[in-house]
Amino acid sequence: MASESAAMDILDSAEASLNVASTALVEKEKKVQPATDETTPEKKAKMEIDAEMKDLTNDIPNSRKSQEKDPDALEDAKDPEADSSIELLCSPTPAEATDVDAMASKTESDNSVELLESPLKSPSSNDVNDEELLPLEEKEKPGPAKELEPKESEPDSKESSKSEALADSSIELISSPTSDDSLAKEKEVEVKEEHGQQAEAQVLQEIPRKADDSFKLQDDIAMEEDVPVPRSKAMQESKETQKTSKTTTKLEPLVDSIKDAIEDCINCNCKRLKKQYVLACVAILNFYKVPRKLKRSQYVCLDCYDTAVEMYEEYAGLLLAKQPLLLREFKQEQADFVTLDSSDEEEDEKTPEKPEFSKNVLDLIENELEDAIKKTLNKVEFSNQFNWSKTILQAKIERLAKKFEEVDLQLAQVQGLADKMHCSVYNSCQVVHKQLPPLDLHQNICPSDYKRLQQLPAAGDIVRPPIKIGETYYAVKNKAIASWVSVSVMEICDTTTGGGVTVKAYKIKYQHMPYPMMKTVAAKHLAYFDPPTVRLPIGTRVIAFFDGTLVGGKEKGVVQSAFYPGIIAEPLKQNNRFRYLIFYDDGYTQYVHHSDVRLVCQASEKVWEDVHPASRDFIQKYVERYAVDRPMVQCTKGQSMNTESNGTWLYARVIEVDCSLVLMQFEADKNHTEWIYRGSLRLAPVFKETQNSLNADCAIHQMRVPRRTEPFIRYTKEMESSNMQVDQQIRAIARKSTSKSGSPASTAAPPTGSSSSSAVRHLNNSTIYVDDDTRPKGQVVHFTAKRNMPPKIFKSHKCNPGCPFPMMHRLDSYSPLSKPLLSGWERMFMKQKTKRTVVYRGPCGRNLRNMAEVHNYLRLTNNVLNVDNFDFTPDLRCLAEYYIESTIVKEADISKGQEKMAIPLVNYYDNTLPPPCEYAKQRIPTEGVNLNLDEEFLVCCDCEDDCSDKESCACWQLTVTGVRYCNPKKPIEEIGYQYKRLHEGVLTGIYECNSRCKCKKNCLNRVVQHSLEMKLQVFKTSNRGWGLRCVNDIPKGAFVCIYAGHLLTEAKANEGGQDAGDEYFADLDYIEVAEQLKEGYESDVERADLDHEDDNYGPDAEDDDDFRPNNYYQKKKEKLRSSRSNSSSTQNTELDSQERTVISFNPNTDLDETVRENSVRRFFGKDQTPFIMDAKTTGNLGRYFNHSCSPNLFVQNVFVDTHDLRFPWVGFFASSHIRSGTELTWNYNYEVGVVPNKVLYCQCGAQNCRVRLL
């Protein structure tokens, strides 16, 4: 019965519209059809039929009431063969039936036939007096007496059958005219069609005029907002007709008050003046453009409901009046809003299922509904609306085009007038323009550098004028590495070398000598007296003035300022403040201005052949690879590193950095300072990079955790544009050297035919060149918690589990920081002077000002939220989400449901997908990896306070002990997690609570072991393959995810890396990192003994294996000192040729960094090496993190399921506040040169980029 009542409600709504449509159709036919003689037989027959149908249609309301009062009687009276449902669908209200009868009595016979061709109404009136309708009346409305007398059931059935027969005969009379009247009716139909076509043509002709009049009328009163636009006469008539046919329906509100109600009006612009609501039907939802929700009830207030109904009535009035709909502008306020709802609705929020239709109703709908709709639309001539709309729109377009032309004409006139005014203003005073010479502006140039730049010569080819007799030059006195002095050329002569080759020699005379001194030298040992007239390129042989005042340490005051031979290591450029970097032959380095450089008269084609043997190899490799890359240490003031000095590696600290030079102060002797080139092999980081490239014949490149905070190596590429011949030769050599094995110490030529096979493989092959303007760009959308209930007004109370609001919907699909705001919390901003602070207000109205108060509140109320759902950073946007509108390829979840949070994949560059990879949440051990996960070997705690007391928690003490070993004074509050935020890495590892602990699963010491909660997205980058970005803001220290994959041994990794690739390898070197952080441990540093009080101490060869003094230079140094002391009268004159102690660019000893004999790894077996995590074919989303030299993530080793130091979990934490839409990156810490014949340049674009990654 419930299904039948629901069907009747649906049919009632369509009943009124069909009746009004029939009434309007009658009015039109009265106007169109010509008058006929009422006395004709056809007319009389149809009048009788009209009277009969009038009696049938007047009994509907009372019959319906009887059906509602006695549904059982209705069920008994229903005949499955009778189309009673369609009759109910078309039955009008009593008021409408009266209007229709009144109209039908005045119309002609054809109008009556037309009216009754629609589906018949079910006869249900009690006022019918005809005797032949009494049985039908008794069937439709059984009285109380009849219901109590079961004996009268048979007469009732007979009467019902008679009524059905009568109803069928009535339908047959109306819908099927007799054959005698067929010819007359055909003629009348033809007349109707002719008049209808003429009327339609007249309407089409009048529509543009009416539309133009309507537009003009609207333009005249557009400025008056309160005065409505007058309607046409036809529209007013349609309104009156609509009012007469309108049915008054009393709506009973389903919700009496909004005070305690959860429901809200579906209209976002509702003023909430009414407190009564009704269920919103599909028509109301469509009117306010609100999507329908199948599992939830949607309500609308009475005001908004009446507004929608009135607007629909205006639409229906125009349709019934057969007027174009576009002549009336229906204004509806629209607001752009996004409803923030969960994808998973609460189970208990379900609308009770509506009863299904009965079989009779379904059969009726299938058979008659489509025909009824077509007939109804045909009666209102709905097909004409398309032609009318097209005509109206075309008229409007033409009118707007005319307006545009007028506006363009007015704009051109105004622009011309403005141009005339502009010219008249500026022509009043004539300005004299004077062309000045162009000025080359350089950014970030200080005044002194700019003045020096103006004094520099222009670039050009190097021209060496011939040596002339009598002119002054510089020449070597004793040795080529010593200082050069001024001489005069006395004579040019020819000499024969040992190979029988005749060369020119020059006899010179030294100036400023108390006695004449003559010598014959070659052109290579002569230099011009004046500075060069052009700028000098890389590798040019010169002598440069060395400033002795900059020398520190033991050589301070000994080395004097003079000209020394060397080569140009850096040209003049803005980065070095327009100075030359000079590599002197004896190993010293210094920056020199152009005025302090002299060009050597003759140089070899291979300039390193003229250099001292101690520096020859280094300068050769430097010149050859300068245009490719230069490895240099990136260091800052105060950093320390191992530095070689006189054959010993000592601990030195950075005092100052000057472009490519660094001033080092040795710890052994505070007075010993030295300027060293940042790419010199005497610096330990550069030396180790070179050694790794030499020893890695078949190595693999692995991502590793940084071992210490030491300076790192950055590879700089110099692309100097020059057309000089020497520079072109150097670049050719540099390019040719890239096809070699890449070993910087190897000088042997490659075998024949191996140049192509040993070519360096560049791995940067994923660049996509696109125009960013034509590609879709994402945007950050700021949501609002629309469905959130505001917190209560605070009243003094003790917080308990009843304070939070009950959860009305699931929050699994939302970001962690948005969950409180969707659960009745508020995040407020307080401003104190210029400082902004964040305060959370709980559902009970209590304000919480820090994480400690939030944690205490969550414990007291047993809230499902956790401390990682809150953050007090003012710049954090909790409800901001990154959104991309259009993509070419999109996947909903690459984890296939394994993660609690879905991980979508997008690609808006092309239709490619990432390489196939099986998703795995945790690491998977392989053959040879013995991973012991026995819980009995784990340390556990018995905390009951969510492990908030680090002093009493056993798991916390493991972490604290490791940190205190290196830094005993560090406060315990700053160690490890701080309310599940890790603000700085713990290199000794973090020990989390495990399954044996008695604490809760969401205690403060459980972070990495939880599944993914951040909303992340895999996307295709333009130059770095696939990457991963955050969809929402991530606070500093928040946990992102772990790095999972196959656990491999080093042997398996080397084997698989060469076959399948090694780009997803991560080294688990926790033991090496922790051991090198131990206090006082420096396996590779030799510290000098500063305590000279113990005279009995005598070191021997076994005490110091690394010390290998250079006896030759020691003796030479002592000889020089003795010679200087014996001849002190000649030290301060230019007569002596100063010879300094030779400093090699290459160290005189090896840096031994082998594994310590007492390493922890020896307890796990012989020849133990770090295990490797491979995410090539199996892994989680951590494999998509790209590298950056300035990353926003850092790596942390965490022990969860095992305390075996060889198998820590690798977790990623945010190193800073990351805004939504930002790519997530971490530092791979690749060792450059480890993999031979492979080059990978960094594309991160950071300011401290290393340029070369592999």
Swiss-Prot record:
UniProtKB keywords: Chromatin regulator, Chromosome, Coiled coil, Developmental protein, Differentiation, Metal-binding, Methyltransferase, Nucleus, Oogenesis, Repeat, Repressor, S-adenosyl-L-methionine, Transcription, Transcription regulation, Transferase, Zinc
Biased composition (Low complexity): 112-125, 739-759, 1123-1134
Coiled coil: 391-416
Residues annotated as binding Zn(2+) 4: C1189, C1242, C1244, C1249
Composition skew (Acidic residues), residue ranges: 1091-1106
Residues of the SET domain: 1014-1229
Keyword Signal applies: no
Binding residues for Zn(2+) 2: C941, C955, C993, C997
Residues that, per the record, bind Zn(2+) 3: C947, C993, C999, C1003
Regions of compositional bias (Basic and acidic residues) in chain numbering: 40-57, 65-81, 136-162, 182-197, 234-243, 1081-1090
One of the GO biological process terms: methylation
Major localisation: nucleus
SMART domains (UniProt xref): MBD (SM00391), PreSET (SM00468), SET (SM00317)
InterPro entries, per database record: DNA-bd_dom_sf, Methyl_CpG_DNA-bd, Post-SET_dom, Pre-SET_dom, SET_dom, SET_dom_sf, SETDB1/2-like_MBD, SETDB_methyltransferase
Domain MBD: 811-877
Residues annotated as domain Pre-SET: 939-1011
Domain notes: In the pre-SET domain, Cys residues bind 3 zinc ions that are arranged in a triangular cluster; some of these Cys residues contribute to the binding of two zinc ions within the cluster.
Stated role: Histone methyltransferase that specifically trimethylates 'Lys-9' of histone H3 in ovary. H3 'Lys-9' trimethylation represents a specific tag for epigenetic transcriptional repression by recruiting Su(var)205/HP1 to methylated histones. Plays a central role during oogenesis.
Annotated protein name in UniProt: Histone-lysine N-methyltransferase eggless
Species this protein is from: Drosophila pseudoobscura pseudoobscura (Fruit fly)
Gene giving rise to this polypeptide: egg
